[in-house]
Swiss-Prot record:
It is found in: Cytoplasm. This is DNA polymerase IV. Pfam families: IMS, IMS_C, IMS_HHH_1. SUPFAM superfamilies: DNA/RNA polymerases, Lesion bypass DNA polymerase (Y-family), little finger domain. One of its GO terms (biological process) is error-prone translesion synthesis.
Length: 465
């Protein structure tokens, strides 16, 4: 266990159900259940409104329907959940390079590895406030609970304390160093990592219901009942001793910074200033990682959603802000801005662990005397990601999936059967839409991809599929 509260745990609130409520205005404030649609289906997530009726994850769909017959049961849209998850994880990686995702909606962050004053509790509180605000903005309305503590165990306990149903209006909780043992003492033994239903039942038979009970028990008794490894671990955790490190799931192969603009940009000087600023931020992260880059990339998304990118590969490796900025601006000079730019990004890749001398030189005015290798890629964005979906079984319309009707517009499936698809024509950011039933074989009815989020994570934060 550390002497500072330097581990953060983020947990998205009712994640799948919250994504559905965000994207379907008519479901805001209503009981929403994701999963459990089929006769033998199981609930994946229930909104807080549905939980008031006793519905919870892993419950049989049939039981959930008995408890909340008027809830909206949706089949789930993994594409939307994955996109929002990538945005959340990318936001966490801005705090620290050490992020350990546990699932799509949950992760640990080692704040000591980032640029955070972990000695200052007020500063840590502010980090959590700003993190929640950024997540809400970038996911366009999703909420999360944040816990901070001196270990993974404490951070997880803190995030549970911060949950909306616990009464924390700011959804932030911090367990100060030195208070850990007292904080966890009254909690159920089930709060200890690794204690599931079977272990909890065995502890119950020993009369050990709370963490304080476990702490007071003889270690030999626990080892005899649970085995040496489990018993010893349980004793240590009950005493708030937890040295498990935050382990990043992967090493980033590139570092980039990009912004999407509210209005398309056409002025070259404005774009140049943005590119130079991005290059400086990228270099700051590059230096923090202790690496040097050989490839610099400039990315742009045009007003028509065409994605343009250009890369320069050096014969040496550098972490110089001036050098990387110079190359990025040089590539910007070849970009036609007349149609407008909606996104600009600067990235570096092809890492080395030491600086390497370049085999070409630059004159006093910054002109390259020997050209590095340049590659260029222009990719038209197809309508698939936000328009009609190409691969979909049109004979099957699961509740909740996205659709587009040539006459009525974008919406989602409320229900289907007997050759009829009942649709609600609304989408994220729209007014509550009207409900209309159309024939299943209506040629104007098309499956659709979900609307994309405006903020997209830098390329290194998008794992390859």
């Amino acid at each position: 266990m550390r002497s500072t509260a330097s581990i953060l745990h983020l947990d998205m609130d009712a994640f799948f159900a919250s994504v559905e409520q965000r994207d379907k205005p008519s479901l805001v404030g209503k009981a929403v259940i994701v999963g459990g649609v089929g006769g033998r289906g199981v609930v994946a997530t229930a909104s807080y409104e549905a939980r008031k009726f006793g519905v919870h994850s892993a419950m049989a769909g049939s039981q959930a329907r008995r408890l909340a017959p008027n809830a909206a049961f949706l089949s789930g849209r993994f594409e939307s959940y994955r996109e929002s998850s990538k945005v959340v994880m990318a936001t966490l990686r801005e705090l620290s390079p050490l992020v350990e995702p546990l699932s799509l909606d949950e992760a640990f962050v080692d704040l000591e590895a980032g640029d955070v004053d972990v000695e200052n509790l007020d500063a840590l509180q502010q980090v959590a406030v700003e993190l929640r605000a950024r997540v809400a903005e970038r996911t366009e309305g999703l909420s999360c609970s944040v816990g901070i503590g001196s270990s993974k165990f404490m951070a997880k306990v803190a995030s549970e304390m911060a949950k909306p149903q616990r009464g924390h209006t700011d959804q932030i909780a911090l367990i100060a160093p030195g208070t850990e043992a007292d904080t966890i003492a009254p909690l159920s033994a089930r709060a200890i990592p690794g204690v599931g239903p079977v272990t909890a039942e065995r502890l119950e038979k020993l009369g050990l219901r709370t963490i304080a009970d476990v702490r007071a028990a003889r270690e030999s008794e626990l080892v005899h009942e649970l085995g040496h490894a489990s018993g010893a671990s349980l004793v240590a955790l009950s005493r708030a001793r937890d040295d498990r490190p935050v382990v990043a799931s992967r090493i980033a192969k590139s570092i980039s910074v990009e912004d999407t603009f509210e209005h398309d940009l056409t002025h070259r000087e404005e774009c140049r200033q943005i590119v130079e600023r991005h290059a400086g931020l990228v270099c700051g992260r590059l230096k923090k990682s202790g690496q040097f880059a050989r490839t610099v990339t400039l990315k742009a998304k045009m007003a028509d959603f065409t994605v343009w990118s250009r890369s320069v590969t050096l014969t040496g490796a550098t972490d110089s802000p001036e050098r990387i900025s110079q190359l990025a601006v040089r590539m910007l000079d070849s970009l036609d801005l007349r149609e407008g730019v909606r996104l600009l990004g600067v990235g570096v890749s092809n890492f080395a662990t030491s600086a390497q001398e370049e085999l070409f030189v630059v004159d006093d005015e910054g002109r390259l005397l020997d050209e590095p290798e340049v590659t260029e890629e222009i990719t038209p964005i197809q309508p698939g990601p936000f328009g009609r979906r190409r691969s979909f079984d049109g004979r099957n319309w699961p509740p909740g999936v996205d659709l587009i009707h040539d006459e009525y517009g974008r919406g989602w499936v409320w229900g289907s059967g007997h050759g009829i698809v009942t649709c609600r024509f609304e989408y994220r950011g729209s007014e509550i839409g009207r409900v209309k039933s159309v024939p299943q074989d209506d040629e104007a009815l098309h499956p659709a991809h979900p609307l994309p989020l405006a903020w997209q994570p830098p390329q290194e934060d998008v794992p390859s599929e």
